[in-house]
From Swiss-Prot:
CC terms in the record's Gene Ontology section: cytosolic large ribosomal subunit
Signal peptide span: none
Protein's recorded name: Large ribosomal subunit protein uL13
Protein task: This protein is one of the early assembly proteins of the 50S ribosomal subunit, although it is not seen to bind rRNA by itself. It is important during the early stages of 50S assembly.
Organism, as annotated: Laribacter hongkongensis (strain HLHK9)
Keywords: Ribonucleoprotein, Ribosomal protein
Self-association state and partner proteins as the record states: Part of the 50S ribosomal subunit.
Statement: the UniProt record of this protein carries the keyword Ribonucleoprotein: yes
A Gene Ontology molecular function term of the record: mRNA binding
Swiss-Prot/TrEMBL GO biological process terms: negative regulation of translation; translation
Amino acid sequence: MKTFSAKPHEVKRDWFVVDATDKVLGRLAAEIARRLRGKHKPEYTPHVDTGDYIVVVNADKLRVTGNKALDKKYYRHSGYPGGIYERTFTELQNEFPERVLEKAVKGMLPKGPLGYAMIKKLKVYAGAEHPHTAQQPKALEI
């Protein structure tokens, strides 16, 4: 019996919608990253993108445990000397609620071309509405 290896054109991808209301950021991001990679499928192959599409709604209602709302920092740099910017979780959540979950999931995916393809299958929305009803996403309870 030969070892099965998934081919990119044979992969069947499903669409799932996840409600992030009152979910803990890290636990939700870990499960989303697992499903974007396709590790929940028996035909998982490390060098092939076998994951599903994930639509996350209510990203503005995510929560973190402990004192991370004030202690967790997000950094970015302009490229110029002294051009570092710092925001807390609460500041980023208020201004760009989608970005918090996107950054958490992106850090859990592989770096390189395969990881970039995987993160494109993640769709995050702050409110309860999303424009992907034509794909008929199934509700996923995490």
